[in-house]
């Protein structure tokens, strides 16, 4: 921006305004070169330690918590289109990280792609519900969207099973298991975490899972430090993809901004 301003003899603020207007009119698209982030020393170390295919590390120097969050979700939004291809069935979890990524995505078009909502609906005070995440992402990618039209959790095992047995719900559950790629984040196990505020888990539920070694939450289900599902009072009452179906996928795309998610992620 500085170089452009000096060359044209205008202020940097004017350059920023011109660029913003050009992006809104879809005259230009600004991207970051992925190699600059996947060859970062920390990215290389993460790949070596955890056996990852690639890691995209966004620097956080000089950024406060909100800025760090925004940098990571914007960086993930820039990289995501390069990871997708025609014919993909992209399974999508829910949460602020996923929703903000979708909001930051440039509108594009990928042929024959389907975005799958992996977790049922919930009563959350936030805007990033499961259906909002999948719908917004599909809109940005120009993809088909398959929403899961059922509650994420029911009051009883019997009611949950009855809903799963309904033909229309059964079809949707069968469809979401056709995913070949997964976009997700890891939730924390704090009392003010999203799984609590969304009404999926009670304090009694949280205590149960924490006592059994819970380290984080994936797709609304508690997992231990190795990413393994923990049995408890919620599993049979939930409607969504089973965690075992997420193991061994061709690609899992984890978006993890913020130091508060470090323990759950590692």
Write out the residue ranges for each language-model feature.
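N-terminal active-site beta-alpha-beta segment that forms phosphate/nucleotide-binding
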Residues: 2, 7-8, 17, 31-157, ...
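Conserved phosphate- and dinucleotide-binding cores of soluble alpha/beta proteins
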Residues: 2-9, 14-20, 26-32, 122-266
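Short glycine- and Lys/Arg-enriched binding-loop motifs that mark or flank ligand-binding interfaces
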Residues: 22, 87, 91, 223
């Amino acid at each position: 921006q500085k170089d452009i301003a000096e060359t044209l003899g205008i202020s940097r603020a004017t350059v920023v305004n011109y660029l913003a207007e050009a992006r809104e009119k879809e005259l230009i698209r600004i991207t970051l070169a992925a190699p600059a982030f996947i060859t970062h020393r920390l990215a290389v170390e993460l790949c070596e330690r955890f056996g990852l295919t690639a890691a995209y590390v966004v620097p956080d120097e000089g950024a406060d918590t909100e800025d760090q969050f925004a940098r990571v979700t914007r960086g993930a939004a820039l990289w995501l289109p390069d990871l997708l291809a025609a014919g993909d069935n992209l399974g999508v979890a829910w949460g602020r990280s996923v929703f903000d990524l979708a909001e930051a995505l440039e509108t594009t078009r990928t042929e024959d792609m389907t975005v799958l909502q992996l977790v049922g609906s919930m009563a959350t005070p936030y805007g990033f519900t499961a259906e909002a995440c999948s719908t917004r992402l599909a809109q940005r990618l120009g993809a088909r969207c398959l929403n899961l039209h059922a509650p994420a959790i029911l009051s009883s095992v019997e009611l949950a099973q009855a809903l799963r047995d309904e033909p229309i719900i059964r079809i949707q559950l069968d469809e979401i298991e056709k995913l070949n790629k997964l976009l997700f984040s890891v939730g924390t196990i704090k009392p003010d975490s999203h799984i609590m505020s969304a009404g999926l888990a009670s304090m009694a539920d949280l205590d149960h899972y924490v006592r059994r070694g819970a380290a984080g939450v994936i797709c609304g289900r508690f997992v231990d430090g190795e990413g393994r599902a923990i049995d408890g009072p919620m599993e049979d009452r939930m409607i969504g993809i089973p965690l075992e179906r997420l193991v061994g996928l061709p690609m899992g795309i984890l978006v993890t901004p913020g130091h508060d998610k470090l323990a759950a992620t590692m």
